[in-house]
Protein backbone atom coordinates (compact mmCIF):
# COMPACT_ATOMS: atom_id res chain seq x y z
CA UNK A 1 0.00 0.00 0.00
CA UNK A 2 1.40 3.39 -1.02
CA UNK A 3 1.97 6.04 1.62
CA UNK A 4 -0.36 9.05 1.50
CA UNK A 5 0.92 12.43 0.38
CA UNK A 6 -0.21 14.10 3.61
CA UNK A 7 -1.07 13.10 7.16
CA UNK A 8 -3.61 15.14 9.11
CA UNK A 9 -2.75 14.81 12.79
CA UNK A 10 -5.22 15.62 15.57
CA UNK A 11 -4.03 15.23 19.18
CA UNK A 12 -7.13 14.91 21.38
CA UNK A 13 -7.78 15.43 25.07
CA UNK A 14 -11.30 16.19 26.35
CA UNK A 15 -12.21 17.90 23.10
CA UNK A 16 -15.86 16.88 22.67
CA UNK A 17 -17.14 20.46 22.48
CA UNK A 18 -15.42 21.43 19.22
CA UNK A 19 -14.17 18.11 17.84
CA UNK A 20 -17.09 17.44 15.44
CA UNK A 21 -16.64 20.85 13.77
CA UNK A 22 -12.91 20.22 13.53
CA UNK A 23 -13.38 16.79 11.92
CA UNK A 24 -16.04 18.04 9.52
CA UNK A 25 -13.64 20.73 8.25
CA UNK A 26 -10.92 18.12 7.67
CA UNK A 27 -13.26 15.71 5.89
CA UNK A 28 -14.42 18.54 3.61
CA UNK A 29 -10.93 19.02 2.14
CA UNK A 30 -10.51 18.68 -1.63
CA UNK A 31 -7.04 17.17 -1.05
CA UNK A 32 -7.82 13.45 -1.11
CA UNK A 33 -4.41 11.77 -0.89
CA UNK A 34 -4.27 11.85 2.89
CA UNK A 35 -4.71 9.92 6.10
CA UNK A 36 -6.36 11.29 9.23
CA UNK A 37 -4.86 10.21 12.55
CA UNK A 38 -6.25 11.00 16.00
CA UNK A 39 -4.43 10.23 19.24
CA UNK A 40 -6.71 10.37 22.28
CA UNK A 41 -4.68 11.10 25.40
CA UNK A 42 -7.04 9.50 27.91
CA UNK A 43 -10.05 11.80 27.51
CA UNK A 44 -12.67 11.59 30.27
CA UNK A 45 -15.45 13.22 28.24
CA UNK A 46 -17.24 12.00 25.11
CA UNK A 47 -14.30 12.51 22.73
CA UNK A 48 -13.67 8.79 22.17
CA UNK A 49 -17.29 8.13 21.24
CA UNK A 50 -17.26 11.01 18.75
CA UNK A 51 -14.08 9.70 17.13
CA UNK A 52 -15.47 6.16 17.03
CA UNK A 53 -18.54 7.35 15.13
CA UNK A 54 -16.47 9.28 12.58
CA UNK A 55 -14.03 6.38 12.11
CA UNK A 56 -16.92 3.99 11.38
CA UNK A 57 -17.92 6.18 8.42
CA UNK A 58 -14.46 7.11 7.10
CA UNK A 59 -11.97 4.35 6.29
CA UNK A 60 -8.99 6.74 6.00
CA UNK A 61 -9.50 7.92 9.60
CA UNK A 62 -7.48 5.98 12.17
CA UNK A 63 -7.35 6.52 15.89
CA UNK A 64 -6.05 5.07 19.14
CA UNK A 65 -6.19 5.76 22.85
CA UNK A 66 -2.94 6.14 24.79
CA UNK A 67 -2.68 3.71 27.75
CA UNK A 68 -1.97 6.67 30.03
CA UNK A 69 -2.10 10.46 29.75
CA UNK A 70 1.16 11.62 28.14
CA UNK A 71 0.63 15.36 28.07
CA UNK A 72 0.34 17.71 25.10
CA UNK A 73 3.87 17.60 23.71
CA UNK A 74 4.36 13.85 24.04
CA UNK A 75 0.93 13.13 22.52
CA UNK A 76 1.82 15.40 19.61
CA UNK A 77 4.95 13.33 19.03
CA UNK A 78 2.93 10.09 19.11
CA UNK A 79 1.05 11.49 16.11
CA UNK A 80 4.27 12.27 14.23
CA UNK A 81 5.68 8.79 14.82
CA UNK A 82 2.49 7.17 13.52
CA UNK A 83 2.28 9.34 10.38
CA UNK A 84 3.08 7.94 6.93
CA UNK A 85 2.54 11.05 4.82
CA UNK A 86 5.24 13.09 3.11
CA UNK A 87 3.65 16.23 4.57
CA UNK A 88 2.30 16.74 8.08
CA UNK A 89 -0.77 18.87 8.81
CA UNK A 90 -1.73 19.36 12.43
CA UNK A 91 -5.27 20.46 13.19
CA UNK A 92 -5.91 20.93 16.88
CA UNK A 93 -9.21 19.71 18.31
CA UNK A 94 -10.52 23.24 18.98
CA UNK A 95 -9.59 24.56 15.54
CA UNK A 96 -10.91 24.17 12.02
CA UNK A 97 -9.92 24.54 8.39
CA UNK A 98 -11.85 27.47 6.90
CA UNK A 99 -11.32 26.56 3.26
CA UNK A 100 -11.86 23.22 1.51
CA UNK A 101 -8.59 23.90 -0.32
CA UNK A 102 -6.52 24.69 2.81
CA UNK A 103 -4.32 21.60 2.55
CA UNK A 104 -4.13 21.78 -1.26
CA UNK A 105 -2.84 25.35 -1.23
CA UNK A 106 -0.26 24.78 1.49
CA UNK A 107 0.90 21.53 -0.14
CA UNK A 108 1.31 23.33 -3.47
CA UNK A 109 3.80 25.69 -1.81
CA UNK A 110 5.95 22.78 -0.63
CA UNK A 111 5.62 21.05 -4.02
CA UNK A 112 6.78 24.16 -5.90
CA UNK A 113 9.55 25.12 -3.50
CA UNK A 114 11.84 22.26 -2.41
CA UNK A 115 13.87 24.69 -0.30
CA UNK A 116 10.85 25.52 1.86
CA UNK A 117 10.69 23.63 5.15
CA UNK A 118 7.58 25.29 6.62
CA UNK A 119 4.44 26.78 5.06
CA UNK A 120 1.71 28.71 6.85
CA UNK A 121 -1.33 30.83 6.13
CA UNK A 122 -2.55 34.07 7.64
CA UNK A 123 -3.86 33.76 11.17
CA UNK A 124 -7.61 33.79 11.78
CA UNK A 125 -8.82 33.71 15.38
CA UNK A 126 -12.15 32.57 16.75
CA UNK A 127 -12.98 33.64 20.28
CA UNK A 128 -14.03 36.61 22.35
CA UNK A 129 -11.47 39.39 22.53
CA UNK A 130 -9.17 37.74 20.02
CA UNK A 131 -6.60 39.84 18.21
CA UNK A 132 -5.08 38.23 15.11
CA UNK A 133 -1.38 38.51 14.44
CA UNK A 134 -0.65 39.48 10.83
CA UNK A 135 2.89 38.64 9.77
CA UNK A 136 2.71 40.67 6.56
CA UNK A 137 0.37 41.47 3.67
CA UNK A 138 2.35 39.76 0.93
CA UNK A 139 2.39 36.10 -0.07
CA UNK A 140 5.96 34.97 -0.58
CA UNK A 141 9.02 32.96 0.39
CA UNK A 142 11.08 34.23 3.32
CA UNK A 143 14.51 33.22 4.58
CA UNK A 144 14.04 30.70 7.39
CA UNK A 145 16.73 31.95 9.75
CA UNK A 146 15.73 35.54 9.18
CA UNK A 147 12.21 34.54 10.32
CA UNK A 148 13.65 33.28 13.60
CA UNK A 149 15.50 36.55 14.16
CA UNK A 150 12.41 38.60 13.22
CA UNK A 151 10.31 36.66 15.74
CA UNK A 152 12.88 37.28 18.46
CA UNK A 153 13.03 40.97 17.53
CA UNK A 154 9.30 41.23 18.18
CA UNK A 155 9.31 38.64 20.98
CA UNK A 156 6.45 36.97 19.12
CA UNK A 157 5.78 33.71 17.32
CA UNK A 158 5.32 35.16 13.81
CA UNK A 159 4.46 31.76 12.31
CA UNK A 160 1.41 31.07 14.45
CA UNK A 161 -0.24 27.90 15.67
CA UNK A 162 0.16 24.36 14.23
CA UNK A 163 -3.29 24.44 12.59
CA UNK A 164 -2.00 27.19 10.26
CA UNK A 165 1.00 25.21 9.07
CA UNK A 166 2.21 22.37 6.84
CA UNK A 167 5.70 20.87 6.85
CA UNK A 168 7.74 17.91 5.63
CA UNK A 169 7.79 14.77 7.78
CA UNK A 170 11.46 14.03 7.05
CA UNK A 171 12.47 17.40 8.50
CA UNK A 172 10.31 16.96 11.61
CA UNK A 173 11.17 13.39 12.58
CA UNK A 174 12.94 14.62 15.70
CA UNK A 175 9.50 15.62 16.95
CA UNK A 176 8.55 18.49 19.23
CA UNK A 177 11.05 19.06 22.04
CA UNK A 178 9.44 17.57 25.15
CA UNK A 179 11.24 20.04 27.41
CA UNK A 180 8.66 22.57 26.21
CA UNK A 181 4.88 22.86 26.39
CA UNK A 182 3.88 26.53 26.12
CA UNK A 183 6.91 27.14 23.88
CA UNK A 184 6.70 23.86 21.97
CA UNK A 185 5.31 25.32 18.73
CA UNK A 186 7.84 28.12 18.35
CA UNK A 187 10.74 25.83 19.21
CA UNK A 188 9.64 23.41 16.47
CA UNK A 189 9.22 26.22 13.94
CA UNK A 190 12.79 27.29 14.69
CA UNK A 191 13.98 23.69 14.26
CA UNK A 192 12.31 23.59 10.83
CA UNK A 193 13.39 27.10 9.78
CA UNK A 194 17.03 26.26 10.47
CA UNK A 195 16.60 23.68 7.68
CA UNK A 196 14.93 25.82 5.01
CA UNK A 197 12.76 28.77 4.04
CA UNK A 198 9.27 29.86 5.06
CA UNK A 199 6.33 30.05 2.61
CA UNK A 200 3.58 32.43 3.68
CA UNK A 201 0.06 32.73 2.24
CA UNK A 202 -2.04 35.79 3.04
CA UNK A 203 -5.28 33.80 2.74
CA UNK A 204 -7.06 32.83 5.96
CA UNK A 205 -7.27 29.09 5.35
CA UNK A 206 -7.53 27.92 8.97
CA UNK A 207 -8.79 29.24 12.27
CA UNK A 208 -7.31 29.00 15.75
CA UNK A 209 -9.93 29.03 18.48
CA UNK A 210 -9.06 30.96 21.63
CA UNK A 211 -10.73 30.03 24.91
CA UNK A 212 -9.67 29.68 28.51
CA UNK A 213 -10.11 25.90 28.75
CA UNK A 214 -7.65 24.95 26.01
CA UNK A 215 -4.37 23.35 27.05
CA UNK A 216 -2.21 25.94 25.29
CA UNK A 217 -4.05 28.84 26.96
CA UNK A 218 -3.50 27.34 30.39
CA UNK A 219 0.21 26.88 29.70
CA UNK A 220 0.61 30.37 28.21
CA UNK A 221 -0.78 31.95 31.37
CA UNK A 222 1.62 30.05 33.61
CA UNK A 223 5.03 30.92 35.02
CA UNK A 224 6.34 27.80 33.31
CA UNK A 225 6.02 29.41 29.86
CA UNK A 226 8.24 32.29 31.01
CA UNK A 227 10.77 29.73 32.21
CA UNK A 228 10.55 27.96 28.85
CA UNK A 229 11.38 31.23 27.09
CA UNK A 230 14.55 31.53 29.16
CA UNK A 231 15.40 27.87 28.50
CA UNK A 232 14.83 28.36 24.77
CA UNK A 233 17.11 31.41 24.61
CA UNK A 234 19.85 29.63 26.55
CA UNK A 235 19.76 26.85 23.94
CA UNK A 236 19.46 29.04 20.85
CA UNK A 237 21.86 31.80 21.77
CA UNK A 238 24.54 29.13 22.11
CA UNK A 239 24.21 28.55 18.34
CA UNK A 240 27.00 30.38 16.44
CA UNK A 241 24.71 31.26 13.52
CA UNK A 242 22.23 33.10 15.78
CA UNK A 243 24.96 35.07 17.52
CA UNK A 244 26.28 36.10 14.11
CA UNK A 245 22.79 36.98 12.79
CA UNK A 246 21.54 38.76 15.92
CA UNK A 247 20.42 42.34 15.30
CA UNK A 248 20.51 45.19 17.82
CA UNK A 249 16.73 45.04 17.97
CA UNK A 250 16.72 41.31 18.73
CA UNK A 251 19.36 41.62 21.43
CA UNK A 252 17.58 44.52 23.10
CA UNK A 253 14.18 42.78 22.97
CA UNK A 254 15.54 39.65 24.63
CA UNK A 255 17.67 41.49 27.22
CA UNK A 256 14.69 43.67 28.14
CA UNK A 257 12.15 40.84 28.33
CA UNK A 258 14.35 38.31 30.13
CA UNK A 259 15.59 40.91 32.58
CA UNK A 260 12.05 42.03 33.33
CA UNK A 261 10.68 38.50 33.78
CA UNK A 262 13.61 36.72 35.38
CA UNK A 263 16.06 39.24 36.83
CA UNK A 264 19.00 37.40 38.39
CA UNK A 265 17.93 34.03 36.95
CA UNK A 266 18.70 35.34 33.46
CA UNK A 267 21.73 37.45 34.41
CA UNK A 268 24.34 35.20 32.82
CA UNK A 269 22.52 35.16 29.47
CA UNK A 270 21.54 38.84 29.44
CA UNK A 271 25.09 39.87 30.37
CA UNK A 272 26.41 37.80 27.47
CA UNK A 273 23.92 39.38 25.03
CA UNK A 274 24.64 42.85 26.41
CA UNK A 275 28.35 42.29 25.71
CA UNK A 276 27.41 41.92 22.04
CA UNK A 277 25.38 45.15 22.11
CA UNK A 278 27.53 48.18 22.87
CA UNK A 279 26.22 50.62 25.46
CA UNK A 280 25.32 53.38 23.01
CA UNK A 281 23.35 50.98 20.83
CA UNK A 282 21.50 49.59 23.85
CA UNK A 283 20.47 53.10 24.92
CA UNK A 284 19.34 53.88 21.36
CA UNK A 285 17.17 50.75 21.24
CA UNK A 286 15.73 51.58 24.68
CA UNK A 287 14.78 55.10 23.51
CA UNK A 288 13.16 53.69 20.36
CA UNK A 289 11.25 51.18 22.49
CA UNK A 290 9.94 53.85 24.87
CA UNK A 291 9.07 56.27 22.05
CA UNK A 292 7.31 53.59 20.01
CA UNK A 293 5.05 52.16 22.72
CA UNK A 294 2.34 54.90 22.66
CA UNK A 295 2.21 54.85 18.85
CA UNK A 296 1.91 51.07 18.82
CA UNK A 297 -1.02 51.20 21.25
CA UNK A 298 -2.70 53.94 19.20
CA UNK A 299 -2.23 51.98 15.96
CA UNK A 300 -3.79 48.87 17.46
CA UNK A 301 -6.70 50.91 18.80
CA UNK A 302 -7.36 52.55 15.42
CA UNK A 303 -7.17 49.14 13.73
CA UNK A 304 -9.76 47.77 16.12
CA UNK A 305 -7.31 45.29 17.64
Regions found by a protein language model. Give the residues of each.
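Short, well-formed alpha-helical segments that are part of the catalytic scaffolds
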Residues: 14-28, 99
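A conserved acidic beta->alpha catalytic loop
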Residues: 40-49, 68
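Conserved nucleotide-sugar donor-binding catalytic segment
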Residues: 8, 121-123, 127, 133-135, ...
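C-terminal subregions of glycosyltransferases and related glycan-biosynthesis enzymes
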Residues: 1, 153-155, 187, 194, ...
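Conserved donor NDP-sugar-binding/catalytic core segment of glycosyltransferases
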Residues: 100-134
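Glycine-rich, basic loop-to-helix element that forms the pyrophosphate-binding segment
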Residues: 66-83, 96
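Short aromatic/hydrophobic "clamp" motif used to bind/position activated sugar donors
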Residues: 88
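Short loop->beta transition adjacent to catalytic acidic/histidine clusters or analogous donor-positioning motifs
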Residues: 3-6, 27-38, 46, 59-62
Amino acid sequence: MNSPKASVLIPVYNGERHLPECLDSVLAQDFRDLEILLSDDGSTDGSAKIIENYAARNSHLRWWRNPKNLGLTANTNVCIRAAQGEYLKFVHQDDLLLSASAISKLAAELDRNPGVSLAACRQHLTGTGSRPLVFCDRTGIYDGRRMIVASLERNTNLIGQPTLTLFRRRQAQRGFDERFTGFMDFEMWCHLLEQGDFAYLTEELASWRVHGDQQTARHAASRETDMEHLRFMEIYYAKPWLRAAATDRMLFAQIYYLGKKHGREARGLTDLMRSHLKCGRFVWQWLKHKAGRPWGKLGRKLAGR
